[in-house]
Amino acid sequence: MDVRFAKREDRDRVVALLRESHEAAGFTFPFQAAYADRLFQQHMLSPMACVLVTGERAQGVLMASAFDHPFGAGRIAKETVWYVTPEARGRGAIKMLDAYEAQARSVGCVSAGMASLATNDVSSLYERRGYSAVETHFMKPL
């Protein structure tokens, strides 16, 4: 399955994928399509962000952005969301990581980051790809 940069016409499909991702993650807060749409638009408009999709009719989405590390470690890329439908997982997902890393390099990033949810731990995949754990985040409802 080919990986490509999203087009504006992919918006509705990407929002649908974000809904699927939200459900798969088991989030307890409601999905907001308007918020997902804004997220897509923001990433599409920023020269320091990307929206990658896999398949002509998108079966996966990876959004990321690049920024200067707050402690001066250089420009870094950070994944915002990565979701691939169950039927499209496998080699297509790996191609998305390849494309993300290439995009990060193209905008001058010295490193790229990925996240792994507690409800869907894919850290072993990242480690096989050369990523290493650097920080663990905790959330507390307020």
Task: Name each model-derived stretch.
Residues 1-16:
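A short beta-loop-alpha structural element at the N-terminal edge
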Residues 19-40:
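Conserved GNAT-fold acetyl-CoA-binding loop/helix
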Residues 41-52:
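A short helix-loop-beta-strand connector motif used in the catalytic cores of GNAT acetyltransferases and
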Residues 57-66:
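Conserved beta-strand in the GNAT
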Residues 68-79:
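A conserved beta-turn-beta hairpin within the catalytic core of GNAT-like acetyltransferases
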Residues 80-90:
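A short, internal acetyl-CoA/4′-phosphopantetheine-binding micro-motif in the GNAT/acyltransferase core
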Residues 89-102:
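Conserved acetyl-CoA-binding loop-helix of GNAT-fold acetyltransferases
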Residues 112-123, 142:
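Conserved beta-strand-loop-alpha-helix junction that forms the acyl-donor binding cleft
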